[in-house]
Amino acid sequence: MIFEKSAPLIQHLPVMVDEILTLLEPERGGWIVDGTLGLGGHTEAFLKQSETVRVLAIDRDTEALALARQRLAPFADRVIFVHGDFRDLRHILVQHHLTQVFAILVDLGVSSWQLGQAHRGFSFQLNGPLDMRMDQTKSVTAAELVNTLSAEELANVIFEYGEEPASRRIARRIVNERVKHPIETTEQLAELVRRAVPFSPKQFRIDPATRTFQALRIAVNRELEHLDQFVTDAIDHLLPDGKLAVITFHSLEDRLIKRAFRVEAGMENPVTDRRSL
């Protein structure tokens, strides 16, 4: 089986770095939590902005953590690296004897670097194993979901997390195909989806596989779970004048985070069925 070569590692350019620096004001000094360290772009910007800032840098991707350690080596005495999930913030802060910090940042979703690593299986544009785990110490992969869930379960995942109107058609195609042979690569899955949802560049602005890949990635990594609790925990551990910044990419996480902010501000009743969002 031949997989495509991953995209070369380039200097990571953090998203909205100027806006984040203006909002979080690292020049105030003290502790910042970077809950999604990635390759360390935001953390590097914080550390360069102020010699008195320290960063608790969390990420569940061990490969990204290793690269970030190299990048941030000049600042090693001001960074604590943690392999973990930002949603476990309360526990992580206790472990490191921190009670309150002046700023917390999380940048949700998959990074461009992760998408460019064929062996991680996040992208339909690079052929690789159908993995999609952000934390490779976890056991469930996208291939396992694709090859074991029922047609109804697959359709629900693709519809709920990918907002894909053709979810049932795609799920049936997957189930029918896996009877013949397991679906193990990103290329296999992408082609199945494209056959289920005919693709014409004139009709579609995005590849038909986009929503299905997003849905499976969210399911594998349980990305939308406990985001509301994270917001509560984060605010509880901010100093009185502290700030929480959350960068969202797609509408599902955006709605959840905005609602959690409204609840914390007393603008909305927290007792709401998440499926109605």
Region spans (language model):
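S-adenosyl-L-methionine-dependent methyltransferase catalytic core, i.e., the SAM/SAH-binding region
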Residues: 1-277
